[in-house]
């Protein structure tokens, strides 16, 4: 059987395994991960604590080269960090002594741009994330959501092929998280770059992703991949969305709970849900 050729900007992860040393013995963190991400695709990776999803993101970013298997971006093996792979973490990691603009500008230190081009790129990305008027604000003067917008702008300012997002909204309140999910979707539609989001929030994964990769823990492995063939913008109250959410949650159900929560409803309807169930109820335990 022949393997399909890798297209431009495609991410190809083949038989990747990762171990850490624990008390002198190897601890398996990832086991035989194989995944191909298409150019411009938004892929969500969801799983509970210990499934290795953040470790996988670090490997793709080039922050850790100690693993078995291969990771290629646009046909080139990932050996180190690169301006072509931006990353955003759960904590914004802004320099507290720099303003919003200066934090974004700092990411351009190694970019082959003139000073004028760098200033223009910073201004463009300040506008892209909706922070006009806050260019000179310091991190302590920004809300958590605004600080994450700066972090996203910093991750995008080098115009990477891929943006990696490691639970970027996990520390935010539900309302701010919802707003930034919409903002991230708008940015993705505008930029049309590949995005890989790691999250433990099933709703977030389905709301944003073209595909959702579910991971099982210890060692981390891909449980299955779900295509999210729903139009954008998506509605969480859409019966199709709810069915997909239930299907994904079934992968994480504890024995004895799944049958009670997923009993077949009468007349082929949807399983009953408590009224006004908050989105946070569908976030997996850390």
Predicted regions span which residues?
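The feature captures the beta-strand-to-loop junction immediately N-terminal to the Walker
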Residues: 46-48
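Helix-to-loop junction immediately C-terminal to a conserved catalytic motif
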Residues: 61
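Conserved ABC transporter NBD signature motif
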Residues: 68-81
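Hydrophobic anchor residue at the start of the ABC signature
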Residues: 88, 152
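Short coil-to-helix segment of the ABC ATPase nucleotide-binding domain corresponding to the Q-loop/switch region
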Residues: 98-106
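Conserved ABC ATPase "signature" region
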Residues: 116-134, 186
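Conserved signature/switch motifs of ABC ATPase nucleotide-binding domains
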Residues: 137-140, 158
């Amino acid at each position: 059987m022949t393997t399909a050729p890798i297209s431009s900007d495609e991410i190809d992860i083949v038989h990747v395994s990762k171990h850490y040393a624990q008390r002198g013995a190897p601890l398996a963190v990832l086991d035989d991960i194989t995944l191909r991400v298409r150019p411009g695709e938004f892929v969500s990776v969801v799983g509970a604590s210990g499934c290795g999803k953040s470790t996988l993101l670090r490997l793709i970013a080039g922050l850790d080269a100690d693993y078995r298997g291969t990771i290629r971006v646009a046909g080139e093996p990932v050996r180190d960090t690169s301006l072509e792979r931006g990353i955003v973490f759960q904590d914004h990691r802004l320099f507290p002594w720099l303003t919003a603009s200066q934090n974004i500008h700092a990411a351009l230190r190694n970019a082959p741009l003139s000073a004028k081009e760098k200033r223009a790129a910073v201004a463009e990305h300040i506008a892209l994330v909706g922070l006009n008027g806050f260019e000179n604000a310091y991190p302590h003067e920004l809300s958590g959501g605004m600080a994450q917008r700066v972090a996203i702008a910093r991750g995008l300012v080098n115009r990477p092929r891929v943006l990696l997002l490691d639970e970027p909204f996990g520390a935010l309140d539900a309302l701010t998280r919802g707003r930034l999910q919409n903002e991230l979707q708008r940015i993705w539609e505008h930029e049309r770059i590949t995005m890989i989001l790691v999250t433990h929030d099933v709703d977030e994964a389905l709301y944003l992703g073209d595909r959702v990769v579910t991971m099982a823990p210890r060692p981390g492995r891909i449980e299955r991949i779900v295509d999210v063939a729903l139009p954008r913008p998506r509605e969480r109250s859409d019966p199709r969305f709810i069915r997909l959410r239930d299907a994904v949650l079934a992968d994480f159900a504890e024995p004895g709970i799944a049958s009670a929560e997923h009993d077949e409803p009468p007349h082929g309807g949807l399983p009953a849900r408590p009224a006004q169930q908050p989105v946070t109820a569908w976030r997996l335990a850390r």
